[in-house]
């Protein structure tokens, strides 16, 4: 089980322990900046996380299971109605954060009693907005829409299959206890690290790059997209319109490549790249 050791971080005042249940209780809103890749966890990574949490939950101990650090930075997020809210820009940890949201959605939709629905309906579940795809549908992702939706749909299917293969009621109850109920002694927690608010966008990108060295490499198209967007954000940090338009146009182009008729017409059957846009 890949449980992080919290003690190694206690000397740093920017680190703290934050239970997943606390993220739900306080209705956190997370923003995934456009220079990051989207959701890319495959089935094995989703299953590994489920198995780790299940192994911890079965022990029924008064203990905590620590996920890897969630690196965040306070920011403002503008809603569709124009109102601004306090949010957290995620610099590292978005894959686990998003996968946990999908697990919580499964529990909410399939395992909650009527009493639990009434208790948690007002503040279930923490929000995540991908700035390059603000309309991303977590409930019913269409794998044909874009690559993020494809991976979301794959992850949701893996979660359903995993719970179906288990003794569902018992396992679902154990998951709810360690993920949702803050009063329970066994809690799944993030190691929460806050980057100081005064850091500028260019420094956020530098932090992101340092954190992601050695991880799964980006595809060619993801690198090109990130360079374009970072260039727009750095040159015109106070005006995000141009960067947002570039992201929107890029997503339209990526979606067009998912059209099989169009793809086979232009590709001549060449499927040797990691993604079609490459």
Describe the role of every protein-language-model region.
Residues 1-278:
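Covalent nucleotidyltransferase
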């Amino acid at each position: 089980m890949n449980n992080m050791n919290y003690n190694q971080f206690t000397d740093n005042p920017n680190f703290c322990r934050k239970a997943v249940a606390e993220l739900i209780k306080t209705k956190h809103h997370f923003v995934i900046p456009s220079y990051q890749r989207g959701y890319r966890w495959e089935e094995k990574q989703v299953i590994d996380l489920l198995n780790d949490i299940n192994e911890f939950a079965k022990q029924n101990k008064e203990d905590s299971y620590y996920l890897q650090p969630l690196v965040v930075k306070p920011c403002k997020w503008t809603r569709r109605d124009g109102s601004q809210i306090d949010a957290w820009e995620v610099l590292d940890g978005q894959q686990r954060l998003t996968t946990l949201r999908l697990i919580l959605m499964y529990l909410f939709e399939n395992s909650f009693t009527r009493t639990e629905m009434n208790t948690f309906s007002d503040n279930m579940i923490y929000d995540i907005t991908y700035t390059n795809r603000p309309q991303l549908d977590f409930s019913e992702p269409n794998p044909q829409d874009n690559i993020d939706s494809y991976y979301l749909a794959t992850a949701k299917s893996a979660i359903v299959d995993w719970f179906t293969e288990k003794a569902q009621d018992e396992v679902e109850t154990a998951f709810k206890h360690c993920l949702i109920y803050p009063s329970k002694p066994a809690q799944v927690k993030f190691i929460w690290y806050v980057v100081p608010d005064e850091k500028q966008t260019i420094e956020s990108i530098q932090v992101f790059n340092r954190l992601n060295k050695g991880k799964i490499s980006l595809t060619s198209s993801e690198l090109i997209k990130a360079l374009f967007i970072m260039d727009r954000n750095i040159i015109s940090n106070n005006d995000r319109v141009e960067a947002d338009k570039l992201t929107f146009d890029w997503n339209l182009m990526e979606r067009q490549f998912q059209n099989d008729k169009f793809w086979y017409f232009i590709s001549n059957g060449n499927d040797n790249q990691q993604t079609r846009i490459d």
